[in-house]
Structures are given as C-alpha cells and as structure tokens.
Amino acid sequence: MSPYIMSTSDLILRVFVDSIPILPEFSTQIRRIEVESQVNLPSSCEIEFTDPDLTIPMECGLDIGNFAEVRAVTGDDAAGEAIFFGQVETLEIQFENSGGKLSVVRAYDASHRLLHGQKTMGYPMMSYSEVAEAVGAEHAIVTEAVPHPVVHEMVVQANETYWDFLVRLAKEIGYVVNVAINPLTGTPTLHFGPT
C-alpha cells in the first residue's frame, strides 16, 4: 500500500500544504480524512492524525492560516483531482479511552469568509448575478456567476451574512451557490448559477 492513506480500491486521498504534499512519515499517521461539501453551504475538511506527541500538524505545516488541499489520486494520475482546498482554521487535540492522542485539523473553503458578521447595504441597478460578482470580488474570491436578465433598482442585504444573502438571492431565481475548485485553474471559485 502507498504511504498515503485512505485507499479504497484504486483511490487514494493525498494531503497537500500550500501545494506541497505532506511527507510520507506524516501521511502514514492520518487516521481519517472527511470532506463535507453541499450546495448552499461552505465546504469543510477534517484531517485526523494519530499523534502521540501532538506535534504532527505543526511539523507538516498545517498551521492555522495555511492552505490545505485534499486530492483524490487514482492509478496513473499522480497529480489527482482536487476535491477540497481551504484554509486551516482550527487545531484540536482529542484523547481516546485507550490512551491514544489525536490531532485534528479543520479547514474551510473560501466561502467561510462570507459567514463572518452581518451587514446591511444596498446594491443599486444590478442583477443578482452582478451582486454575486461584487460580493466575490470584495472578498477576493474568484466568481463565476451565470448572468440573470433582471436588473433590480435596489438589491438589499438586510442584516445578513454575505453567505446567507447570496443563498437567498440564488433561491429566489432558482440558482445555487457553492465554492468548488476550478479544474482548469486549480483555484477555488464561487459559483452562482442554476443547479
């Protein structure tokens, strides 16, 4: 078996930190990788290490603020396909009854930035797609918004997080919101468009 873990038949999940694969000595200590990705919700990733000394996350560069990526690798495709890209937000320690110590790294995709704080503001003479592009630009998130023909005199964000605001707009016109990795560029991209 490869030094990288989570092998299911021919599928292997590999962890990268700032685009560099973590060393085999650390990847063999990975006990669990869980990626949650849903439409209209930010994606998250948890990486759990068996870690008796509680040092692995720092030693392999998974410090708070660094970027973690999980790629699904199969057969001949050594680069694999990115299934998660996000920023490390928390490091946790867990203890098992058997005496084992675990380090848990939690990362969130770029859309989690849109959940920080509620705001009230207006967007004059814009379509919902243009509003999504403006919000993405304000938060330095590459945005792909499918144009919508209706231009509104004023679109109001009323004491909502940016994320809740975009989800509300999307639902009104039958669109969805998510952040996914663009396979052509490898960058996280905010999608605002039909299902």
Language-model features, listed with the residues they occupy:
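Juxtamembrane "anchor/assembly" segments of surface/extracellular structural proteins
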Residues: 1-67, 103-112
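Short beta-strand-centered interaction patches in the first periplasmic/extracellular domains
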Residues: 2-3, 102-105, 109-111, 145-195
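Generic marker of residues within folded, mature protein domains
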Residues: 3-5, 37-39, 60-62, 76-78, ...
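Broad gene-expression machinery/nucleic-acid interaction feature
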Residues: 12, 44, 67-69, 83-85, ...
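Short amphipathic beta-strand and strand-loop transition segments with alternating hydrophobic
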Residues: 31-37, 89-96, 179
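Surface-exposed cap/loop segments at beta↔alpha junctions
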Residues: 55-146, 154-155
